[in-house]
Regions:
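Gly/Ser-rich "nucleophile elbow"/oxyanion-hole loop immediately N-terminal to the catalytic nucleophile
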Residues: 158-203, 219
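Conserved alpha/beta-hydrolase "acid-adjacent" motif
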Residues: 296-302, 328
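Cap/lid segment of the alpha/beta-hydrolase catalytic domain
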Residues: 98-103, 114, 122-176, 229-242
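Short, aromatic- and glycine-rich surface loops/edge beta-strands on solvent-exposed regions
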Residues: 416-431
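Catalytic-loop region of hydrolases
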Residues: 18-89
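Surface beta-strand/loop "capping" patches
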Residues: 338-377, 393-406, 411-412
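Hydrolase active-site cap/lid region
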Residues: 211-260, 317-320, 326-331
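Short beta-strand/loop motif that positions the catalytic acidic residue
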Residues: 283, 289-291
Length: 468
């Protein structure tokens, strides 16, 4: 323990994180890479398991805001590191997770981290309490959680212009601090140097996965999960045009009247800070985007607003009959493990391409040997709404055969009423005994939007518009 505490003193002002100086630096870069005297970690417990050890770490990633703004400024996290007895890779995995700051010491690792670490002979760590929560802001009596915190901090940014406010800044810094701590602890405990990371997280943590990859050169690949919302403004407008309302899942943003800022200079300024699409040139690394076809937050056709413009190696996996809790009752975690193993072992990912034809069909051609190709489809006769909450487990699969031109063509029948959503799923075998499932984007027929989104007639005024 003394040796670990010595590292806290020595490295509080010398972290492994390196800014990506090949790009123009943003306020997010500056926030993440600024020295924070609060950074420290303490090894609370070491647990020996069959073929692995677990390190339970009390991590302080930073100080966020001031005591005049918020009830707790120090961000505390439980960082749980699973280290297999034999480490074969200098790349590890960081999973950014949620949780609340209840002070309870974790009793051990989650089973998934153990399985991933032992299956890949690599270090797998989970970072909790991203964001720290609940948080109570000055002038409010009730604590906020999750999206309610994000929405509040967006509103504060719109009115003040202070880039210390958006919660994504602190969430990103917490992930960077976790990578620092992992490197220090693993090298100290067994002499292994972890040089790179594959970063993953779901929902708000999926967004943080993007921003972490954008600011830290240690990130070798990213796996953002259920955050199908890059290029936010057209994505959200598409959301309303499909539903005619804002889905209940994003009510926290409605309550803070965030949508009334659409089209303003303040909203544009925020997107420059926190929307990965605005710095898409940074994402040359391999990317697996895992989304739920029945997500209650995001429209399944949202990838049309960003995917084609992303550079480098990129893959989609839309999971049928899944909602925002995409792992429940699905094989999504197997896809993530197969992709992670391919990065560790430098196994090339499958090569394939698709074309979204004018007649509504999806044409797929695969250079790599494919095990199975399926078209998944679901129909809603009443609305362009494919949330699992609305249609249940309505997605059905149909096997596709390769034609004489080497193409797999998905051409669903037009629904008698309503709308039909569909996509193509390719299953590839891997050397690891795991199937890797990848998909095309989701299409909808008829490709019509039942509602017309209109921006608020009276837009809000903030730190930029008030200057006029």
């Amino acid at each position: 323990m003394k040796k670990i505490l010595l590292f806290i003193i020595c490295f509080a002002n010398f972290l492994f994180a390196e800014p990506r100086l090949e790009f123009d630096q943003t306020a997010l870069d500056e926030y993440v890479h600024s020295i924070d005297e609060s950074f420290e970690y303490k090894l609370i417990k070491t647990i020996s398991g069959e073929g692995y050890k677990t390190y339970i770490v009390d991590l302080t990633s930073q100080s966020y805001l001031t005591k005049n703004d918020i009830d707790r400024t120090e961000w505390k996290h439980w960082l749980i590191i699973v280290s297999p007895d034999v480490i074969k890779h200098q790349t590890g995995m960081l999973v950014i997770g949620a949780g609340d700051n209840d002070g309870k010491i974790p009793q051990g690792p989650d089973q998934l981290s153990v399985e991933y670490a032992k299956a890949t002979n690599s270090v797998v760590a989970s970072l909790g309490m991203v964001p720290n929560q609940p948080l109570t802001f000055s002038g409010e009596s009730e604590p906020r959680w999750e999206d309610a915190i994000i929405a509040y901090t967006w509103d504060k940014y719109f009115t003040t212009g202070e880039d210390r406010w958006p919660l994504r800044m602190a969430m990103t810094k917490s992930a960077v601090a976790a990578m620092d701590a992992i490197q220090l602890i693993i090298e100290d405990m067994n002499g292994t140097k972890i040089e790179k990371f594959v970063v993953s997280g779901a929902s708000k943590r999926g967004w943080t996965t993007w921003t972490t990859g954008g600011v830290d050169d240690r990130v070798e690949a990213i796996i953002p999960v259920v955050i199908d919302v890059l290029n936010l403004e057209p994505s959200f407008e598409h959301h309303w045009s499909a539903y005619g309302f804002w889905a209940p899942a994003i009510q926290d943003y409605v309550d803070m009247e965030i949508m009334d800022w659409w089209g303003t200079k303040e909203m544009e300024s925020l997107f420059e800070l926190v929307d990965p699409f605005n710095v898409k040139e940074r994402y040359q690394m391999p990317k697996l985007l895992v989304n739920a076809a029945g997500d209650q937050f995001f429209i399944p056709t949202s990838s049309q607003f960003y995917f084609d413009e992303l550079p480098g190696e990129k893959y989609l996996r839309y999971v049928p009959n899944a909602d925002h809790n995409v792992a429940e009752g699905t094989d999504a975690l197997q896809t993530i493990l197969a992709f992670y193993a391919s990065i560790l072992n430098k196994v090339p990912r499958p090569e394939f391409s698709w074309e979204l034809s004018e007649d509504g069909s999806i044409e797929v051609i695969s250079k790599s040997q494919v095990k199975e190709v399926m078209m998944w489809s679901a129909t809603n006769e009443k609305a362009r709404d494919f949330r699992k909450d609305t249609i249940g487990n309505s997605w059905v699969a149909e096997n596709l055969k390769q034609n004489e031109d080497g193409l797999y063509i998905a051409r669903p029948s037009m629904p008698k009423e309503g709308w039909k959503a569909y996509f193509v799923e390719m299953t590839y075998e891997t050397p690891f005994g795991l199937d890797l499932k990848l998909t095309t984007p989701v299409r909808v027929t008829p490709d019509t939007l039942p509602f017309e989104y209109k921006r608020p007639e009276k837009q809000k005024k903030g730190f930029l518009s008030n200057l006029n």
